[in-house]
Amino acid sequence: MIFSTEFDILTLVILAGITISQSLFGVGILLWGTPIFLLLGETFVQTLTLLLPLSSMVSLLQILPRLGQIDKTIFLHFLKYSMLGIFVGLNVILIYRPDINLLVGIILFASVCLKIEILSKLIHRAVYKFDKLFIFIIGLIHGLSNLGGPLLVLRVSLEKFDKEIFRTTIASVYLLFAMVQLIILTFQIGYIEISITYFLFAAVIYFLQDFRDVV
């Protein structure tokens, strides 16, 4: 990994918005950041190297004070069954370098459709029957597009956790996803460049948002 201090004002503004979304709702940095930076002309690899360190850091900050509130059963399920999906999906992207803009658009549209009650109930029933396969598919979609978050939220929501366990468990799985993606990127590309400025900026925004909620 190579660390730099370069930054861009527009990028800082975008990162502020998506970091606030992540701190409030548990998703945002990858869900919104990925399509935004692709639309701005960044490659998928460049988008990953920008967003993954930030996502992992914010997830870590979310779970450190609440380690005891991570549901270990769910975390271990994702550790067992989603890693292969991420490995396959991300390696397909890195090796064949397809244009994923259409795929990202389809997944975002499908994420909106998850809000439809009838469709959501059908998916819930399918998940109960094919849970391991569903978790693998979440990993595969995340590896291909960086947008496994909505399905992750859907899967964890089936457990009817209270708010803190729900958010902390999602953050722990997001951290797991990001670490695996960064490892794959490092091995496939040889190095990735991480801007310390963006990294620290996201941390400041997270703490400011967290402080505002406390006050």
What does each of the following model-derived ranges do?
Residues 1-2, 32, 90-98, 122-124, ...:
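Membrane-interface helix termini and inter-helical loops of multi-pass transporters
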Residues 1-9:
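Short, strongly hydrophobic alpha-helical membrane anchors
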Residues 8-76, 135, 139, 143, ...:
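Small-residue-rich hydrophobic segments that form or flank transmembrane alpha-helices
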Residues 45-117:
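Membrane helix-loop-helix hairpins that form the core translocation module of multi-pass transporters
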Residues 89-94, 154, 213-214:
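Small-residue-mediated transmembrane helix hinge/kink sites in multi-pass secondary transporters
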Residues 100, 106-110, 130-138, 149, ...:
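Hydrophobic, well-ordered secondary-structure segments
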Residues 110-120, 144, 148, 160:
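Short, well-ordered alpha-helical segments in soluble proteins
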Residues 114-138:
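Alpha-helical multi-pass membrane helix bundles of inner-membrane/thylakoid proteins
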